[in-house]
Amino acid sequence: MNEPMSLFDDLPEEHDEPQEAPERRLPMVVLGEMVIMPHMTIPLQVPQGKSYRAMERAWEEDRDVLLIFVREHQLEGYKSNQPQNLPPIGVIAQLQEFAKLNDGTARVILEGQSRAQIIEAIQITPFYRVRCRPYTDPPVSGLEVEALMETVKQQVDEFVEHLGEVPQEAVQFVHRIDRPGHLADIVTWGPAFDFKDRLEVLNTLDPVERLRKVYLVLARQLELLKLRVKIQQDTKEVLDQSQREYFLREQLRIIRRELGEDEEGDDPIDELRRKIHELDAPEYVKNQALHELKRLAQQGMNNPESGVIRTYLDWILSLPWADEELPEISITEAQKVLDADHYGLEKVKERILEYLAVRKLAGDKMRSPILCFVGPPGVGKTSLGRSIARALGRKFVRTSLGGVRDEAEIRGHRRTYIGAMPGRIIQAMKNAKSKSPVYILDEVDKIGLDFRGDPTSALLEVLDPEQNNAFSDHYLEIPFDLSKVIFIATANQLDPIPLPLRDRMEIIEIGGYTEDEKLEIARGFLIPKQREFHGLTEDQIEFTEGAILKLIREYTREAGVRGLEREIASLCRKVARQVAEQTEANGELPPKFVIDEAAVVKYLGPERYTYGIAEEQDEVGVATGVAWTSAGGDILSIEVLPFKGKGQLQLTGQLGEVMKESAQTAVSYVRSRAADFGIDPNTFEETNIHIHIPEGAVPKDDPSAGITLTTALISALTGTPVRRDVAMTGEVTLRGKVLPIGGLKEKTLAAHRAGIRTFILPKENAKDISELPEKVRRELNLIPVSSMDEVLRIALSRMPTPANNQNGSHTNNRGQPSPAPAGT
C-alpha cells in the first residue's frame, strides 16, 4: 500500500536553533524494544546485571540515567561487553523509585526527561557509562504548525472512536498539549506505532518533522483500520442466510429429539400462519399479520427481534375483529334491570331508555351518542353503566383515567420502544373479547396534562362517532373499528373537561340523594348486599329505620351512599364476629341482633356530624349560605364582626379570589346604601370589618355567596338578627341585583338535610325548581328573589330603619351597631 500523501510535506520550519547544552556523564541502561519517550513515566522490574548496577549507582548519585533501545537480538552483545555501535539518540530519564526485592530484582519507576545525543561510551564494567549532550526542543510557531497539530489531534479522536475503551482523560490530555514535539512524543505511545516507528520518531530531533512523521503513520493506520472494518462487514453479508437457518433448524431438530419431544409437532411459523388464515378479520388485518409473519420466518425464531414480532402477532390474533350478532333490545326488560339496580334517578333512567329505544329502531344507522354521567362520588355513575350492559346483554369493560398524563396510555407506544404495548383502549377490547361492549371511561375529569402529550386529544378520536370506526393505535398501526362500542364517560365535575371533549358527549347530571332516597337505597340494596357478603341472614341481623336515619344524618355527610355502605358493612362485621363467637361458645346460633340507634353508637362510637338546623337561634352578623362541592352540597355559616378601627376589611377562612371580590362587592353595595339601612356613613371610616367563613382549613371559592355576605354585613352593622331557619344562595351586583347560580339541587339537598325551612334562590333559577326531588319541594319553602331588598325582607328578623326615619332602636347616634341582643 502506498503511503498516504501528506498535506504538510512542504511545511516550513519556523523555529530557532537550539542552544548547545553542556555534556553529561550518565550511567546507561539498555532496554529492549520498549521505547520510553520524554514526558512518559513507566514502571519496570529490572533483573540483576549491568542495567541493575547502573540504576543502583544512579540512585546513589543524581538519579539520572540514559536509556537506549535496541532490538532483542542486540541485547546479548551489551550483556557480554561487546556492544555494537551505540545508537545516536537516547533518552535521559530520572529514577522516581528504586526498590530492591527479595528475589534479587528491583522495582523501578522511570520518568522520561529529554532526548540526548550520545557521544561515546566511557565505561563498560561493572555498568555502562556514556558521555551525552541533552537536547531540548526549540520553540516553534506558525499557522502551518497549528494546522498540523490540529490534524493529528483529529486523527487521535478518530482512532479512539474506532478502538473504544480509551479513558476520556487521556484524550483530553492530548488536546491540551500545545507543543508539536511534545504532542508527537505522547501520541507515539499509542497502539498505531510499532518499535520501528517509535525509534524513528525518537531519532528525529526537529519537532515539526517529528510530528509530520507521526501524522503519516496515523494516516496509514487509519486507512488500514477502515479497510479492515469494511472487509468484516462484507464478509458478514456474504454469509448465506438460508444456509445459516438450515444449520439452526437441524440443531433444533436434534435438541427436540434428545429431549424426547414430538418431531412431528407443528412448526411455530406454520401454526401462526394457520391461525391468521382462520382469523375472522378484514383483509388488511390479515395482510399486515402475514407481512409480519414473513419477517419472523426470515429472521428465525431465535432472533432477538422475533419476540417483538411474536408478541405483535399474538395481539392481532387475540383482538375481536369480527362483527357479532347482538341480542334484541327489550325496553321493558331494560327498565326492569335499571329499577332493580338503582333506586330513584328517574330523569337519568328516562334518558337511558330513550337512548335504547332509538338504538332499537335505528339499528346500525344510528351514530351512538357518547353519554357522560356527571355527579358526586357514590351516586351510582359506574354501576349505571354496568346496568346498561346487563340490560343490553353486552360485555362490560371499564378503564379508569384518573391521573393519566401520557397520550401513549390511550394510543399505546410504537413498537420501536422496548416493552411497547397497546394503549388502554385496545387492551380493554382484548379483555372484553367483544367488538361491541359497554365501555365505561371513568374519571375523565381527572386526566392530567404534561410534556408527554395531552391524553384528552387522543380521546377525541375515540369518542367521535365520525372517526372511531378507524381508531389507530400506535402499537398496532392497523385501523380498529370502535363504532359498535357504547362509550359512557363519568366525571365528578364538568369544568375540568376540555371543551372539545365535552362537545362530543351528551351530559347527564346525576345529583345527590335525599334522605328518603338514601333510606330506601339502604333498605333495598345496601343492607341485603352487605348481609350476604358477610354471611349473615335476615334472622341474624335487622336494622331499624331510626338506626339507618342516624347513620345517614350523624355518621355520613355525602351526596351518594358510598360512605353509608361502609358504615353498614362495619356494623355487619361486628355482628358477624359476635355470631361466630357465641356459636363457638354455645354450639347454637344466637338470637337476632337488632341494630337500633343505641347499637349504632355502641359499635361505631360517638356521632361524627351534627344534624339539625344551621344555627340554634337568630344571631346578629351570622347568615347561613350553601355551597356546592364535589361530594354534593354543604351549608356555610358566614360571620361578620365590626369593631373600632380605620375602615379596613379583613377576610379569613381560605377564601378564593372570586369570594374575596364578592365580599368587596357586598361592602361597596352596603356603603352606597348606608342611609337606607340606618347606618352612619362615618362607620365605614371608623370601623374595621372582619368576615370569616368556617371551616378555616377548607378552601372556598364561589360567587353564589354574594347575597349571604351582604345579608350578614347589613345584620352586623345594624344590629338586626338573621333568621336561623333561612338559607340563601345567589350572586350580588353593585346595584343589588341577584344573579343566577349553579348546583341548585345539591344546595337545596344540603339545606334540607340541615333542617332549613326557608330557602332563598335567584329568580332566574326558578325554572330549575321542577327538577328538585318532590320531598324537597314539599318541605322546603323555596322563594325566588331578584334584588337584595327582597332578600333582606325574608332573611332579617326585621327591616333596618332608614337614617331619616330611625328611632334609635338599631343604631346609636354615631351610626355604630348597638350591642347584640341577649343570647346572641
Curated annotation (Swiss-Prot):
One protein family per Pfam: Lon_lid
Q: Where is the composition biased (Acidic residues)?
A: 10-20
Gene3D superfamilies per the UniProt record, alphabetical? 1.10.8.60, 1.20.5.5270, 1.20.58.1480, 3.30.230.10, LON domain-like, P-loop containing nucleotide triphosphate hydrolases
Intracellular or extracellular location(s): Cytoplasm
Q: Does the keyword Nucleotide-binding apply?
A: yes
Active site, renumbered = 704, 747
User: Which intervals hold domain Lon proteolytic?
Assistant: 617-798
Q: Which InterPro entries match?
A: AAA+_ATPase, ATPase_AAA_core, Lon_bac, Lon_bac/euk-typ, Lon_lid, Lon_proteolytic, Lon_Prtase, Lon_prtase_N
Using the chain's own numbering, where are the disulfide bonds?
Answer: none
Q: What is its EC number?
A: 3.4.21.53
Q: Where is the Lon N-terminal domain?
A: 26-222
Region Disordered, as annotated, extends over: 1-23, 800-824
Function, as annotated: ATP-dependent serine protease that mediates the selective degradation of mutant and abnormal proteins as well as certain short-lived regulatory proteins. Required for cellular homeostasis and for survival from DNA damage and developmental changes induced by stress. Degrades polypeptides processively to yield small peptide fragments that are 5 to 10 amino acids long. Binds to DNA in a double-stranded, site-specific manner.
Q: How does it assemble?
A: Homohexamer. Organized in a ring with a central cavity.
PANTHER family noted in UniProt: ATP DEPENDENT LON PROTEASE FAMILY MEMBER (PTHR10046)
The text of the family note is: Belongs to the peptidase S16 family.
Annotated protein name in UniProt:
Lon protease
Source organism of the structure = Chloroflexus aggregans (strain MD-66 / DSM 9485)
